[in-house]
C-alpha cells in the first residue's frame, strides 16, 4: 500500500501531524518502535494549556510557579494567572498516539533502517518491510536519521533520574552558563535532570539529547522536519512540548495544501517562523551566559517585582515574541546590579 504521508516518530510532533492529516482524510502511517523512553521534565506551559486545554488522564500535578537558582542565589516566581501542569510523559504520548489512531492513522511498530527520497515518492525500509509514501514527516527527535536529512546537529547531553522525595508545586531550574538542571515535581516523586554541552554528566540515569536551536532548513523535496528533529525548543530552558505539537500541526497543514496543489513544501518554513520567535529567547540566553550576569539575573528576579514578572512571561510562554523594549529592560536592570 502507498500512503499519502508517512510520519516517522510517535512523539507529540508526530502524533499531532498524523491526527491532523487523518482528520483531513489523508492516508497516514505512523512508524515508531514504541519502545523508547524520553528524557523530559514533562511540563505543559501556560502557552500550551491556553492553546490546547488539558486532559487530566496524564496530569500528575498542577503547578503554582517556578524557582530558579544560580549557586547560592535563589528566586521564586509564583504565577499570577498562568496555569501549568506537570504530566506523566509516557501517558501523554500514549494519549496523543491513540487520538491519531482513532482519527484513522495506521501504526507500524517497527524501526526505520533507511529512507530514500526520489522524484516520485519516499521509500522507507524497516526491519520487516518497505513502505512507500508521497511525503514524509520526520518526527524522530535527534537521531542518525534526522541528522541525515538536515536535522539539528547542535544539542546538549542530558541525564534524568527519578527520585522518591516529597514533591511540591514548583518547578525548579538551576541555571549555569550554557546549561541547566531541573527538578520536576510529579505525583509521588520528582524527576531531576542535568544537562551539559561537552558530554553526558557522569551520573546514572536515562540519557537523551536536547536540541539547542532550529536548523536552517526544515524541508526538502518530500520531507518536513518537526519537533526536536528540527531543533524546536526554547533556548532559555529547553521547553519543547508546545513547539513539538504545534510544529506537527503546521507541517500537516502545509502538506494538506501541497497535496491540494495550493503551496510548496517551503511554505512550512515561512509558517513556523511566523509563529515561533526564537531570536529574543536566544538573545536572553546569550546575555546570561557568564557567571556575573547570570547571578545578577537571578538576583533581579528575586528582588524586583517587575523583573520577576518578566521572567514569569519567559517561563510560562505568556509572551514568546518579546519586544525590543523588553530586551532593553533586561539589559538595563542587569547593568544596574553589575555596576
Please identify what each model-predicted range represents.
Residues 14:
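N-terminal Rossmann-fold NAD(P) dinucleotide-binding loop
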Residues 33-70:
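N-terminal FAD cofactor-binding segment of flavoenzymes
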Residues 256-339:
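C-terminal helical "tail/cap" subdomain of flavin- and related membrane-associated enzymes
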Residues 10, 22-40:
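Glycine-rich FAD pyrophosphate-binding loop
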Residues 79-99, 197-198:
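Short beta-strand to alpha-helix junction loop
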Residues 114, 130, 195-262, 266-270, ...:
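FAD/FMN-dependent oxidoreductases across multiple families
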Residues 1-11:
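Beta1/beta-strand and adjacent pyrophosphate-binding region of the FAD-binding site
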Residues 10, 99-207, 211-219, 231:
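Predominantly flavin-linked oxidoreductase catalytic cores and closely associated redox partners
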